[in-house]
Amino acid sequence: MGLVNLNPPNVAVNIAEDIRNSDTVTAANATTTTSVALAANPLRAGYSIYNAGTVTVFVRENATVAAALYKHPIPPGYLFESEFTSSRYTGIISVITASGSSNLMVSESTIAA
């Protein structure tokens, strides 16, 4: 988690309540070839990826990911959850491994219309 300013300036903020739908969970597989864990979704509220496999999976919020160019590594047995305190990311989420393959459980929640 990054730095958080606990003494922000007095600025008016317009906050709208987002109502989420229930999560959708799918099984996915990460290999040494880039694959899409989640397609772009303009209604995405958040997502999580659990690495149920035996090798580290590299994740990036982009169509391009590599074992040397990624945003988050997910070791075996770990869960990555998107940051809920920042703006929503609605684009493609890609995964890859440096070697071998890994089974993933990918969960996505969407905003109710």
Residue ranges: model-predicted function:
Residues 1-21, 108-113:
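Short, intrinsically disordered N-terminal pre-domain segments
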Residues 50-72, 106-107:
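Short, surface-exposed beta-strand/strand-loop-strand elements in extracellular ectodomains
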Residues 29-31, 69, 75-79:
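Tight coil/turn sites that cap or link beta-strands
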Residues 21-42, 65, 100:
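Surface-exposed ligand/attachment interfaces on beta-rich extracellular proteins
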Residues 63-65, 99, 110-112:
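Solvent-exposed strand-loop boundary residues in beta-sheet-rich modules
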Residues 74-90:
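Beta-sandwich interaction modules
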Residues 45-47, 85-102:
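Noncatalytic modules at the cell exterior or secretory-pathway interfaces
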